[in-house]
């Protein structure tokens, strides 16, 4: 399936995926949270945060919303920035 003439690949290393990771890292840091602190808020291991922040794994939309609420971060603003790259 294509969007705006671009193929949507499954690569976790796409520009949009990297942008999402970078925006999530920036939001966490702006909130003054460590990976460990955010993980505790989500009842997840620190490795969960590390893996999506490094692009080792993707997060689904439900996880994304939960993470944004835990930070807290504006999920709509983050998605709007990522959408420009898709």
How would you name each of these model-derived features?
Residues 29, 43, 54-56, 83:
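Residue-level detection of the helix-turn-helix DNA-binding "recognition helix"
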Residues 32-52:
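Short alpha-helical DNA-recognition segment
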Residues 62-78:
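DNA major-groove recognition helix of helix-turn-helix/homeodomain DNA-binding modules
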Residues 22, 32-33, 59-62:
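Residue-level signal for the short linker/turn that defines the boundary of a DNA-recognition helix
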Residues 19, 50, 57-60:
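Hydrophobic transmembrane-helix microenvironments that flank and shape a buried ionizable site
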Residues 29, 40, 69:
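Alpha-helical residues within the helix-turn-helix
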Residues 1-22, 26, 30-31, 73-77, ...:
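N-terminal flexible/basic segments that precede or flank functional cores
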């Amino acid at each position: 399936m294509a969007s705006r003439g671009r193929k949507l690949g499954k690569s976790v290393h796409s520009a949009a995926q990297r942008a999402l990771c970078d925006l999530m890292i920036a939001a966490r840091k702006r909130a003054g949270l460590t990976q460990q602190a955010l993980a505790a808020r989500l009842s997840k291991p620190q490795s969960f945060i590390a893996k999506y922040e490094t692009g080792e794994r993707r997060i689904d939309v439900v996880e994304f919303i939960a993470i944004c609420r835990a930070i807290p971060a504006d999920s709509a603003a983050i998605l709007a920035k990522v959408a420009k790259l898709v």
